[in-house]
């Protein structure tokens, strides 16, 4: 299991240069399951909408991309909602993160799972918290 930040999946579907893509896809297509907090799909869909607005994607692309993503072994963690009342804001304060990013950190800590992220602030906080980074 690994925790998947929306930055990684957006870079993958938007064909941005990023080193995690091939290895992540290999692991997801074999045995790896990605855990994501409940707000993950909102971040992904918002990122796709922004890509359409910026003309990086055609208007019909997000639906096809979401179909592709939905076929990946991604498990939405509903416990994130419960943790948002206490642990997540504490992590956000301790590491100077948004609560959205702190939710990824909380999930990685709780699951004792590596974190896949392209966000440098989140990666730095993960290292400080003893979380292994994927890639």
Where do the language-model regions lie?
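Short, well-structured N-terminal submotif of metal-dependent ribonuclease cores
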Residues: 1-39, 51-63, 128-129
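Acidic catalytic patch
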Residues: 38-41, 61-94
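Acidic, PIN/NYN-like endoribonuclease modules and their adjacent C-terminal/linker elements
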Residues: 1, 105-135
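Alpha-helix capping/helix-boundary segments
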Residues: 8-9, 40, 83, 104, ...
């Amino acid at each position: 299991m690994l925790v998947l930040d929306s930055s990684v999946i957006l870079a993958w579907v938007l064909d941005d240069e990023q080193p995690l893509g091939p290895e992540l896809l290999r692991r997801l297509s074999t045995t790896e399951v990605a855990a994501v907090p409940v707000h993950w799909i909102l971040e992904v869909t918002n990122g796709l909408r922004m890509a359409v607005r910026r003309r990086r994607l055609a208007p019909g692309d997000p639906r096809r991309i979401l179909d592709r993503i939905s076929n990946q072994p991604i498990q939405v963690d509903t416990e994130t909602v419960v943790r948002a009342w206490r642990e997540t804001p504490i992590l956000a304060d301790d590491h100077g993160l948004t609560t959205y990013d702190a939710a990824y950190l909380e999930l990685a800590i709780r699951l004792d799972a590596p974190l896949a992220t392209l966000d440098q602030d989140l990666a730095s906080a993960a290292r400080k918290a003893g979380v292994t980074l994927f890639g």
